[in-house]
Swiss-Prot record:
Protein name (Swiss-Prot/TrEMBL): Pollen receptor-like kinase 2
Gene: PRK2
LRR repeat windows: 87-109, 110-134, 136-159, 161-183, 185-203
Location in or out of the cell: Cell membrane
Organism name: Arabidopsis thaliana
Record EC number: 2.7.11.1
Loss of function: phenotype: No effect on pollen germination and growth. Prk1 and prk2 or prk2 and prk5 double mutants have no effect on pollen germination and growth. Prk1, prk2 and prk5 triple mutant shows reduced pollen tube elongation.
Post-translational modification Phosphothreonine, affected residues: T438
Amino acid sequence: MESKCLMFVSIVSVFFMVVNGVSETETLLKFKNSLVIGRANALESWNRRNPPCKWTGVLCDRGFVWGLRLENLELSGSIDIEALMGLNSLRSLSFINNKFKGPFPEFKKLVALKSLYLSNNQFDLEIPKDAFDGMGWLKKLHLEQNNFIGEIPTSLVKSPKLIELRLDGNRFTGQIPEFRHHPNMLNLSNNALAGQIPNSFSTMDPKLFEGNKGLCGKPLDTKCSSPYNHSSEPKSSTKKTSSKFLYIVAAAVAALAASLIIIGVVIFLIRRRKKKQPLLSAEPGPSSLQMRAGIQESERGQGSYHSQNRAAKKMIHTTKLSFLRDDKGKFELQDLLKASAEILGSGCFGASYKTLLSNGSVMVVKRFKHMNSAGIDEFQEHMKRLGRLNHENLLPIVAYYYKKEEKLFVSDFVANGSLAAHLHGHKSLGQPSLDWPTRFNIVKGVGRGLLYLHKNLPSLMAPHGHLKSSNVLLSEKFEPLLMDYGLIPMINEESAQELMVAYKSPEYVKQSRVTKKTDVWGLGVLILEILTGKLLESFSQVDKESEEDLASWVRSSFKGEWTQELFDQEMGKTSNCEAHILNLMRIGLSCCEVDVEKRLDIREAVEKMEDLMKEREQGDDDFYSTYASEADGRSSRGLSSEGINLS
């Protein structure tokens, strides 16, 4: 009986898979019929002989279509939303660099869509105000380099999960609205927007708002004129004017009196407070790290003077920084708290702050909130282990501060920013990306740093555990510096499983285990990201599997030869380096093997990269043509005169 039930379940499962496959096939073919395909044979694979998951530009997960990536195909015609509604798992659409125009399609009918990319098309009409109503899952919207007109849609302003918004290079008019949720990436440059920039955007890069002649206010240098035009106010009689004047004077006197009373009370309370308890804090200004991070140095309850004094002495002991490096000048936590601070970003574990000390040193303070799994003794012992690490491709931890509720890590400030910013952020600002020799040097350095961690932290299954492009900083000479390594023993298990890269690996997703090769998988994904220039999130239907999705996409697209659709054209290639780029892609895919037994170990991966480097040094004079010795020569600067144009 049990075997019959199992057989029935299997038959039903197969039946539904077949029905779904046919349904998605017919749905996509119907969608294809609405397109005008400019590039010959661009969608030739879209036929009934092959399953949809093998079609060009179709992204699948577990046999279901979750994304369409139809870029650079000279497509026009209409985007058949009704057909796309038949794809129940659809989460991502990309039609970048095509020739679509006309009315804005009704994407709001695709309520589960997470990302939409329409950059570099020919849309030239107004977007309806309700164009994004009901799209509560929308995270990323790229509409740059079109000719959209009219105001920014009000429905877009209400999007609860929007983290990326690019509207640059259009003809949007009107004022910038107040967004309900502040996007992490926003570019409104080169439009016809006017009015004052909302205060919530006042600390952003001015370049994100340039090219709008009517905009004023921070972060631009253009000051806004008074919002009131008194000359246009209607004239009133002398009697009414005098009456209004008397009311204004009376109100001003009353307000002044109330202010004086409040100030007096505040001064009284401050003096009373100073007499009753010791003041440990350095009284930082409003832009200090203490004010920005909300760090408190002491608990100021209503106990007696003696109990507060004992607490104060205890806090003096516990607020000392523990230094891991002797080559840095010593400073106290109070020096950090009273220093001017600038928030650099907020990652999955907490915020990072850039601080300028009185001695001129620039440090970064990273605040961790998910480190309650280790007691103070265990925590300090592990920090000493990390402090003993010394490698040119690791960012050292200078000092740390321990408190049960949160921890602070102090490190040197690296002005050149992260690899993620150079790969993805610079594009949004129209700046050149990293060239090929620089990218290869970064990959090689990351591999060496990772190998060092595996040699010196042998007790950890994943010595890094959180390798991704935003955790790779670049020095002035574009040497990679790994950060956020060795954190797994200190991060709460639940938070680690939710947030850390190691727990997104195939072996953990499928078997709930982390292995010695898990970091190698992270290295492989990083190599693919560097070579393709693709954002991992662009491939994510289920966020925790985004890296595996990128590897699957590359594996299905890579045919052993150079293709413009697969490789990032921003890095360029010289006449003799194509084979080396392809070999590095093969190394990356070998690191991304889903089967752990078939995956390279870290030593094998690094050896293959070193062998590739030797080949370059022996036979590729072209390799160094864009690889100057000066720091500015190895920056994001495109091709040399010998480069091949990939456009």
